[in-house]
Amino acid sequence: MDRRTLLKLLAATALAGCNTQDDATKDLKVVVAGAGIIGASIAYHLAKAGAVVTIIDKQGPATHASRGTFAWINATWAKQPRSYHAFSQSSVANWHDLHHALNLPIRWGGSLEWFENPERETKLATQIAEQVEWGEPARMVDAAEFAILEPNVAFNTGVTAAYSPNDGTVDPVLATQKLLAAAEQMGATLRYPSELTNVELANGRLTSVETSSGSIPADRLVLATGAAPDIAARIAGIELPQRTRPGVIAITEPMPRLLNRIVSAPGIHMHQRDDGRIVLGEQDGVPQNEAHALRLAGRPNNFPSPELAQEHAQRMLAVAKTFAPGIAAASIDDVYIGWRPLPIDGHPVIGASSNRPDTYIAIMHSGVTLAPIVGQLATLELLDGIVVDNLDDYRPGRVFNEIKRY
């Protein structure tokens, strides 16, 4: 969707109201800190709109949360309340535009999800009924329909599964790289390794961004820095309470087609990319003990040794094999610890810092789902001086109440 069309859409619908400021600005120099999927989308949309864009990252594109994500594009039952669900639905739809515009590595086909606990299974059915009321084409399916949708997955005939046909998956590393490459083709500059260290102000206004690779003139700074714990407070002067947690992603070598859709089974998530690689994500998280706490204190992305990484991946494969026996033949290619940015109320943080209005924050879980719409709306706010009312619930200055949604 181009910027002109998006402006017309926002003006014409109640979904995302917006108020135009009198001092709309154009041709701004914008530094985007963070070359993950959110930063890449914002940079792409800014460059497309004519901004002078520089993207910086202390390591490189998609080397942090965006590498360690299961990469599930969805607007499922966890997206509460209804306004957040609608926001997610809009972004899922916008992924189709990006898919075709940039030939992104996305696989559509939906998801199947179920639980072993009878009470949780009953609650899931209630949640899916609510999703249907909200316009999501989801439904519960029995074992017979499940076998048609996913014939290579063993399914307990005593339960039903939630089928969400609009869901998809993306290769987050390749998608990030393609978004950044497209931004560069439109004049953006990508600098790495280049760590954000400070900002320079003159009369209270941003003049430059200081990095480990030098100073960059800037009118605006975007913080798309994921789970980094202190950057928002240090650079934007605002505390963002997070309960950041690790999640392990294991990726197999390419193998013949086994899975048609995303499968969210008890204890394991799995999907298969177009290149044949199967992506595994664990559900239960790391054990809560002192040894793991010490090991994870520095937020590592890699296991202490390749042997430990393989041991962990083999445990994940063993769980996956109970549902998809054909995965027993898989060989593990990569194991990575991803650190997910999780604001404690489960919602994204999007908007300018009240303490430093020249600094725009875009930090969230579900970054893969929300990347397209966040890129579009952040560009409207940064370049067109538009205040998008639909983002009001996600501003950095809100009151954060802890709600566990995932």
Where are these regions (language model features)?
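N-terminal export signals
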Residues: 2-21
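N-terminal Rossmann-like FAD-binding beta1-loop-alpha1 element of flavoenzymes
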Residues: 30-54
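Glycine-rich FAD pyrophosphate-binding loop
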Residues: 48-66
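Dinucleotide-binding Rossmann-like beta1-alpha1 core, especially the glycine-rich loop
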Residues: 71-149, 267-269, 277, 300, ...
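Active-site lid/adjacent beta-loop-alpha segment flanking the redox-cofactor pocket in flavoenzymes
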Residues: 256-356
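C-terminal catalytic lobe of FAD-dependent flavoproteins
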Residues: 321-406
